[in-house]
Amino acid sequence: MMEILRGSPALSAFRINKLLARFQAANLQVHNIYAEYVHFADLNAPLNDSEQAQLTRLLQYGPALSSHTPAGKLLLVTPRPGTISPWSSKATDIAHNCGLQQVDRLERGVAYYIEASTLTAEQWRQVAAELHDRMMETVFPSLTDAEKLFIHHQPAPVSSVDLLGEGRQALIDANLRLGLALAEDEIDYLQEAFTKLGRNPNDIELYMFAQANSEHCRHKIFNADWIIDGKPQPKSLFKMIKNTFETTPDYVLSAYKDNAAVMEGSAVGRYFADHNTGRYDFHQEPAHILMKVETHNHPTAISPWPGAATGSGGEIRDEGATGRGAKPKAGLVGFSVSNLRIPGFEQPWEEDFGKPERIVTALDIMTEGPLGGAAFNNEFGRPALTGYFRTYEEKVNSHNGEELRGYHKPIMLAGGIGNIRADHVQKGEIVVGAKLIVLGGPAMNIGLGGGAASSMASGQSDADLDFASVQRDNPEMERRCQEVIDRCWQLGDANPILFIHDVGAGGLSNAMPELVSDGGRGGKFELRDILSDEPGMSPLEIWCNESQERYVLAVAADQLPLFDELCKRERAPYAVIGDATEEQHLSLHDNHFDNQPIDLPLDVLLGKTPKMTRDVQTLKAKGDALNRADITIADAVNRVLHLPTVAEKTFLVTIGDRTVTGMVARDQMVGPWQVPVADCAVTTASLDSYYGEAMSIGERAPVALLDFAASARLAVGEALTNIAATQIGDIKRIKLSANWMAAAGHPGEDAGLYDAVKAVGEELCPQLGLTIPVGKDSMSMKTRWQEGNEQREMTSPLSLVISAFARVEDVRHTLTPQLSTEDNALLLIDLGKGHNALGATALAQVYRQLGDKPADVRDVAQLKGFYDAMQALVAARKLLAWHDRSDGGLLVTLAEMAFAGHCGVQVDIAALGDDHLAALFNEELGGVIQVRAEDRDAVEALLAQYGLADCVHYLGQALAGDRFVITANDQTVFSESRTTLRVWWAETTWQMQRLRDNPQCADQEHEAKANDADPGLNVKLSFDINEDIAAPYIATGARPKVAVLREQGGNSHVEMAAAFHRAGFDAIDVHMSDLLGGRIGLGNFHALVACGGFSYGDVLGAGEGWAKSILFNPRVRDEFETFFHRPQTLALGVCNGCQMMSNLRELIPGSELWPRFVRNHSDRFEARFSLVEVTQSPSLLLQGMVGSQMPIAVSHGEGRVEVRDDAHLAALESKGLVALRYVDNFGKVTETYPANPNGSPNGITAVTTENGRVTIMMPHPERVFRTVANSWHPENWGEDSPWMRIFRNARKQLG
């Protein structure tokens, strides 16, 4: 039976206004819209009055429900029938954890009530199309239609293909019907194999073969034999990549054979809880570094949010499934798309060439895709710390003559680093009889065909198969699985995981054969043991679907009880679905039909399938010389600063958590003005050291339109000039991921790909001492469509994205582009040696040209000398700032440095030649260093020692003020105010934020950037930062116990425990399942801290599901109430823990006036480094800090204080319960965005109880308790930041 319950309003006023404006623009006469959430409960038994009241209360969250009956025509938007939304999975979990077992499933829709003039049926269809994502949702005309969401079908049997009766044609028909993308020789191979077996194949076997042997999974082109211009080539592409490892194997521990590569890290104290006692402590051991970079291009073109989200999620799983289990740590994200054409903000170079109906626009991708990628990283609890963004779409004269080149099929890049124990780098042995396990969520009918679909050019497959390729993300489930993996690797030698892979393309049909085959075994499986939420699925759908957040593992049978215990504690679902066998054979039994859908020798599936041969021709690009007749430097500056590739990326940065883990030493945002210009990302290796890891990206794809090899060399060079900003040492410590995107089969592209791989794998990397131990390829970067009567194609440039990874010697020595105005000198290191080529530059692009001669690596020895010189200068602390030269050239390098330093620049470019346009806008390798004036001679001498004398040019200096002046021989070349340039540079991010977020907030942020008087972040302390007030108490040896409380989806508990540990506490890991299961009580604890994260993925209100699981469980409710009433206890709630505790007001004495925390005013997750002041309040944790003003990490989507009315706010203030407020950089309490990131009244961001024993706050002091973890800080701070005082206050209060 289904029950319908109304929910809160679904859209803020500005979202409704945006919808109305879209309808008006489409000439749809819609006058008013009201939208509210509607909940549908699928019940297996009726609820009594108490249970009904509980369910009703559970579904009350967010803004207050409208009391009026909505008017207008109803359009109900729900998930597509036959799918289960991530919201549904999490909400159902909450209901069950609150004891409502009668609820089989909760689902949510949005009821739109539309008041409109008379509309035709077609116009109503247009209205409906604006309200939903056709790939994921459907529209019903009535609420009761939602019953279709809960219809269960009978299981479907396996289907056989009559190969023996119909011959080869049966396979050809199945290939088309199932979208298998099989090549002719593969059809021949299958015909021969099954004829030998003497039986017909089942559809599931063909599908499994197609996924396991797709280009996406098997990388056939990279393993192919090559004939170029009639000459056989000596090596495959992959062999040339492997040559880098054969030449420079140094520091590599694992390459080419696992889900990620591994290199040597540093010996540090890894901080985690003991399995038996729950007590956190440091464990001194090597923290080796793993690295992986994936792409998820096809799904992102079809449905950007889930496409990008599952792209990030899949890469995170690759990291976790490395060796015998590892820990993902920090991420990177990148996008290449066609021109944005922002409505009302179209740029002169952005022609509309049309697109296929089935893919979304570049603007849609960049609106939704980054949000999806960020949301997954945020909810999983991994900071995303670097990235890139390129737009390109133009008709150019390239290798194949004049044609359309661009990214209608986008690049969505997802990568990152992690850590792994030394003894877990290599996978173990799968013993015969080992249990074969699926860890993670249930099978669902989603993502079918992802591997094969990704291997086709967009436009080749059937639209229904595109629907089938759309995936669904549930990062909170993946976090639970990762917690299980963490518990396993933390057991060291007792780790129960023998072997692990992630489930990606092809689902279990790819993952399980790969698992047993890699382990040298076979497998015997039972289909019906696979967890499934949809009983009507066929065997093919159960075995081959790509439900996300799953891993496959081999666990020894005697270790199963331990594994079961770990999974239950973390509430991570798992199923034992088979056993490892001696014989390398794969069998899948189906209990329901008592038949055998799969019965194959593994070598048929994964054996010597036909090897590809690429017989291709070389084409040379001619290009056209740049026509510069109408180009002025002033206009060029304006245009280039508006090119999205160059322009400010704040709209892509602040949506992503950049502080979780407490180990982020360098994020994108630089300096007191938080400008997103960092060259690389840096993390600390642990919470007790200054060793670390660095990541950077290099990518110069448009150059490939003129010179394939040069483009590849520049990508490597740019990654190197970016990562050189931190202290690494030996260049051999740097390891690269190479991600290759090409339109294989397009004239000239295959030979160009070979040239590019050879240039990097056989030449440049070996010469530099660089290794490429990991990478990925995507070989179908083309879209086809009909535009009127014309057949069109959009082909991407050959695109190599290089991600560089390295161990860092001392993270404190990382340089940024932030200029200093002390007596200084700016020096250009020009690795282009005066070539100043303008082909395929940003300058050429904004004037709709390509040019003829591009930049290149001019001298490999000098590139190596540059890196070595930078390392010497970084180690000697001789540099004040560094920024590489890349898109936009020297002009942009200097401008971004001035933006970061909020200062002026006076430079002279006479030494760079007479062609000022080329000097300022060429994109040759190199960059600008800033040195102290007195160090200039010594620095130039050192650069000369490294062979760079002819590359170094003195430019001028940074000055206080607002003028950005470029001269040549004292003649002005360009002069403008830095503020004007900053505003131009920011306009793209402003317009994107206006479109995507609350436009009022976007306007306020843009206005703030234009304020030259802004002093930037600053610090005022009312206490001595160097005083350790906890030291006398630590000296007694007594360590009070703090319960570090987490719920499923939590993610800030480790750094929280470390902060309390440093202050003299014994931090104990306490999961809510421990309390609900009665394994642990709160009676033995002196302090309680509820940590941040996304409990239940913020479903049913941030923190509210967590709170209600306490309030609706009588025994646990009593535990908390007793704790809060006990004298001599302390409690802290941070972020998600703050939201949770604010919903426990009925249990906490003196908290009656506390507010609720609701959706940010921007309607967006906000990750900021915000200035707060400590106000006078009873809070025991903030004693002695009153009046202090300092920045703190902020990461939340629902942090806005909501009070009932003005009287409630006045009472909260008059009682003095406000503990922290947001202030602007002038020290004034603010409600203005982004200084106040959520719009809370009076800047309120922390409150306390009347006795001060319980304090709750939205910002994260635990993430910045170490100075090194602050995005910016005064140079005189030591190891501890001022926020460490909170934790020491806690220790002092407990005596």
Swiss-Prot record:
One of its GO terms (molecular function) is metal ion binding. Residues 1041-1295 form the Glutamine amidotransferase type-1 domain. Mg(2+) binds at residues 679, 718, 722, 884. Disulfide bonds: none annotated. It catalyses: N(2)-formyl-N(1)-(5-phospho-beta-D-ribosyl)glycinamide + L-glutamine + ATP + H2O = 2-formamido-N(1)-(5-O-phospho-beta-D-ribosyl)acetamidine + L-glutamate + ADP + phosphate + H(+). The active site is at 1135 (nucleophile), 1260, 1262. ATP binds at residues 307-318, 386-388, 678, 886. It is an enzyme of class 6 (ligase). The keyword Translocase does not apply. It is found in: Cytoplasm. One of its GO terms (cellular component) is cytoplasm. Residues 305-327 are annotated as: Disordered. The keyword Metal-binding applies. Transmembrane segments: none annotated. Its EC number is 6.3.5.3. GO terms for biological process: 'de novo' IMP biosynthetic process. Pathway: Purine metabolism; IMP biosynthesis via de novo pathway; 5-amino-1-(5-phospho-D-ribosyl)imidazole from N(2)-formyl-N(1)-(5-phospho-D-ribosyl)glycinamide: step 1/2. Keywords: ATP-binding, Cytoplasm, Glutamine amidotransferase, Ligase, Magnesium, Metal-binding, Nucleotide-binding, Purine biosynthesis. Monomer. In the N-terminal section; belongs to the FGAMS family. Phosphoribosylformylglycinamidine synthase involved in the purines biosynthetic pathway. Catalyzes the ATP-dependent conversion of formylglycinamide ribonucleotide (FGAR) and glutamine to yield formylglycinamidine ribonucleotide (FGAM) and glutamate. This is Phosphoribosylformylglycinamidine synthase. The lineage of its organism: Bacteria, Pseudomonadati, Pseudomonadota, Gammaproteobacteria, Enterobacterales.
